[in-house]
UniProtKB/Swiss-Prot annotation:
The gene is ndhB. It is a multi-pass membrane protein. The keyword Protein biosynthesis does not apply. Belongs to the complex I subunit 2 family. It catalyses: a plastoquinone + NADH + (n+1) H(+)(in) = a plastoquinol + NAD(+) + n H(+)(out); a plastoquinone + NADPH + (n+1) H(+)(in) = a plastoquinol + NADP(+) + n H(+)(out). This is NAD(P)H-quinone oxidoreductase subunit 2.
Length: 521
């Protein structure tokens, strides 16, 4: 094989966005080693600049002629580009919200940025990986970096406990996933590329070993997306971990898990489509019900948002279960919307904890009287998570539920509507507590609420992150047509889709034979 032919097959430009992040994390690490704590003044901005460059490079890769790189191991198609952009955006907002948090804790910002960028690179590679070894290495890169970030506050016993729990359960999940991949490798006759595995398994009967491999793979993916009953780690890890880490895990890590689910399940298990859809139907039902019901009883904002994220994962799984192009498009769109409204909520929680040192829901009582802007911001994000119009979360759920209804998943859609109403209750409860008007109803924490100051290091990035997420949460739904065009284009090459993309304008369509009312979104 000559050099030119090898270079064309490697097609290294497909991973250029990840390459920029790798260079950035090396520079951040070297800066922290060389300059110590003084590097905190510029390392976050270097990381932000590299993420902005990464997003631009992803934009330039859209609809590229040859998206396959590294001898077929990596696919930079439009679907992977959208998921990688979601992860890069979540990391960018996480950095904006974390600078002041890490600075106030007394920890090293450079080390934190290095580990966070490492997790981002692993997650982005996972979105496009099409070879078993690359899938596993990418997943482990993301997982190990996540363990390190979870226990980053070394002097906090809760952070250490969360890291240990996450490590033990995550290690078991990785072992199960690896065993599932090994079965897939053996049954396919030693193939490692997903397309080759699918081709080798085309004539294979639904053997017990193949079903076991499917179950093991789904169990590991479910752990990554925090689906019930593989969610036990989520509340404890979310409560004990640094809040910026929780924000990244709730969006970036979850998006990578769903990207892996789409690519692995639709390509590597051609004979078991009905089986994995049935399993994910059960997971979606359990996640929507348990996540939203248990969230009602929580007294900590971080634990409430943890169970909320479990319920949100159940909603997203509706798009995965129905297996249509409209389902995948609505799933990707909802993840994009979820990024802004969830990170916006966590930004508000961080800002409140920086000023008060607590995240208990009861301590938010009367916040409106002392900090009306923070109250408004958190209220908008929570209402959007609940799906209240005209905020972005409403349109995300509308597209998702309509795709499910079109595909005939009436039970899942109705359950999703019911559990959405349940979620509104615990979101409204927090808002109601914040807007009490009587001074005697204020919590002791709010009575001693400090004056609002934006001058300390890291407060301006936090302010920028909050404004960005609020603008997106408020307008992304109303101005959704460009986003829908992007997500519809991104799923055009997804295998096994069964129906057309989501329409792009609201209309009443009446067919000559069968009258139907279909909102074209």
């Amino acid at each position: 094989m000559d050099v030119a032919n090898l270079a064309s097959q490697l097609n290294a430009t497909t991973i250029l966005p990840e390459g920029v992040l790798v260079i950035s994390l090396i520079l951040v690490l070297l800066g922290d080693i060389t300059f110590g704590r003084s590097s905190a003044k510029w390392t976050p901005y270097l990381a932000i600049a590299s993420l902005a460059a990464c997003l631009y490079l992803l934009y330039t890769q859209w609809d590229q002629a040859n998206p396959i790189g590294f001898l077929g191991s990596f696919n930079a198609d439009n679907l992977s580009i959208v998921f990688r952009a979601i992860i890069a955006l979540s990391t960018l907002v996480t950095i904006l919200m974390s600078v002041r948090y890490i600075e106030q804790s007394g920890s090293s910002i450079g080390e934190f940025m290095t580990v966070l960028l490492t997790a981002t690179v692993g997650a982005m590679f996972l979105c496009g990986a099409e070879e078993l070894v690359m899938i596993f290495i990418s997943l482990e890169t993301l997982s190990i970096a996540s363990y390190l970030m979870t226990g980053y506050m070394k002097r906090d016993s809760r952070s250490n406990e969360a890291a240990l729990k996450y490590l033990l359960i995550g290690a078991a999940s990785s072992a199960v996933f690896l065993y599932g991949l090994s079965l897939l490798y053996g049954l396919s006759g030693g193939k490692t590329h997903l397309d080759d595995i699918a081709l080798a398994l085309t004539d294979t009967s639904k053997s017990l070993a193949l079903v076991i491999s499917l179950v093991f793979v789904i169990a590991s993916v479910s752990f990554k997306i925090a689906a019930v009953p593989f969610h036990q780690w989520t509340p404890d890890v979310y409560e004990g971990s640094p809040t910026p880490v929780v924000a990244f895990l709730s969006v970036g890590s979850k998006a990578a898990g769903f990207a892996l689910a789409i690519r692995l399940l639709t390509q590597a298990f051609p004979n078991l489509v009905e089986q994995w859809q049935f399993i994910f139907t059960a997971l979606a039902i359990l996640s929507m019900v348990l996540g939203n019901v248990v969230a009602i009883a929580q007294t900590s904002m971080k634990r409430m948002l943890a169970y909320s994220s479990i319920g949100q994962a159940g909603f997203v799984m509706i798009g995965l279960v129905i297996g249509t192009e409209a389902g995948y498009a609505s799933m990707v769109f909802y993840l994009l919307i979820y990024l802004f409204m969830n990170l916006g909520a966590f930004t508000c929680v961080i800002l409140f904890s920086l000023r008060t040192g607590t995240d208990e829901i009861g301590d938010y009582a009367g916040l409106y009287l002392k900090d009306p802007l923070l109250t408004l911001a958190l209220s908008l994000c929570l209402l959007s998570l609940g799906g209240i119009p005209p905020l972005a979360g409403f349109f995300g759920k509308l597209y998702l539920f309509w795709a499910g209804w079109q595909a005939g998943a009436y039970g899942l859609v109705l359950l999703g509507l019911i559990t959405s109403v349940v979620s509104i209750y615990y979101y409204i409860r927090v808002i109601k507590m914040m807007v009490v008007k009587e001074p005697q109803d204020m919590s002791e924490v709010i009575k001693n609420y400090p004056s609002i100051v934006w001058k300390p290091l890291g407060m301006r990035p936090l302010q920028v992150g909050l404004v960005l997420t609020l603008i997106a949460t408020s307008l992304a739904g109303v101005l959704s047509n460009p986003l829908l065009t992007i997500v519809n284009s991104s799923v055009a090459d997804v295998p096994r889709f069964k129906q057309a993309t989501i329409p792009t304008s609201i209309d009443v369509a009446i067919q000559p034979d069968t009258p139907t009312i279909a909102p074209e979104l």
